[in-house]
Amino acid sequence: MATVHILTQYVWPDAAPTGLYAEQLAARLEQDGRDVRLVGGRGGYRELQRKRPVARITHLNHYRGSRGNLRQSFTEYASVTRAFCDYIGRFVRHDDVVVVTSAPPNTVTLAQAIRRRGARSIYWLQDYYPELVRGLYEYPVPLRAVFRRFWDHHLGRWDRIVKIGSNLGGPTRNAVVIRNWPTMSFDRPTAPEPRTALYSGNLGYGHDIELLVHACGKLRTAGYRVTMRSDGRGAWQLPAWLQPMPLENDPAKLRDDLLRHEVHLVAANPKITQAIFPSKIWNTFAARRKLVCTGFAGPMIEELEISKLAPFDRHLEQWTDLIATAQNSGQPNRVERIEPALA
């Protein structure tokens, strides 16, 4: 039986958002009877207590930097990517399928290593880095164009790119949109506490903190109690009245926290509309809570409106269908033109 290898920087027991989605895809494939390996590093992003998701999990050795230190982070990115390349050379076989997430970003260069093994390659584009880096430094337009050409050249080498939103940049020739889904179930949503609002998650390079603080201020003036649970560089920039609390590391408590609040806040950056699409909106939709978005502009607003109508209970099924098609393909390196939308 051909193996599906899913590679991402952080995997269980860590709970980075990209890693959570990777493990939930791996669990679904394992339930369907496929041979699956979930492969990641040994670094840490965020703790979340939960059971082992699949039988076969491989943690690779690599340099581990300090989160928040850019130099050390980039060194870790390079080290993780080298570890992935070594894994591909040692364990990937002809007709296998290799799914690689955009964490770390250097993995965009791995398509050729997968191709040399005669396997199918799928790149899971959660973040489009030529635009995301603008949240760190608004670099000159000519340099931005060079970076986009470099990135798009490497994206074009993959058999498939799966974008989590239609607003993400990158080529369309080999791309398809399969949106994310709720990472937890809300079988019986309860009534929230009135006049409560919650931001829960990372505040990083893709978020405009000033716009988020302004929205929180308006809610506060309207009588809402605003709870801020966040980490990341943006959390350091919050005013005293919005000082963040620790993120919940117990899934049951996180679910209760989401259900307890009437309004969920989601932040973006209007300057970088092709970089990301916040995955936390899917838990908000599933919990049937009100959504307040800040920093959404242009294609992000269009994607938000599509997402409100998207059948998120089918998105994992779309993934399994895509992988089944890749496994059944007699020509692993052939790319057919497809439209960049499934939902």
Would you name each region that the model predicts?
Residues 42, 164-167, 178-181:
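Carbohydrate-associated surface elements
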Residues 106-109, 113-116, 129, 141-161:
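Membrane-proximal helix-turn-helix segments that form the acceptor-binding/catalytic region
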Residues 189-207, 213-216, 227:
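Conserved donor-binding/catalytic core segment of Leloir-type glycosyltransferases
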Residues 176-195, 208, 330:
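Acidic anion/phosphate-binding donor-loop and adjacent secondary structure
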Residues 207, 250-256, 264-285, 292-303:
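Nucleotide-sugar-dependent
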Residues 1-51, 160, 214-223:
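N-terminal subdomain of nucleotide-sugar transferases
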Residues 79-84, 89, 97-117, 123-126, ...:
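An aromatic- and histidine-rich active-site surface loop
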Residues 230-258:
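Nucleotide-activated donor-binding/catalytic signature segment of Leloir-type glycosyltransferases, i.e.
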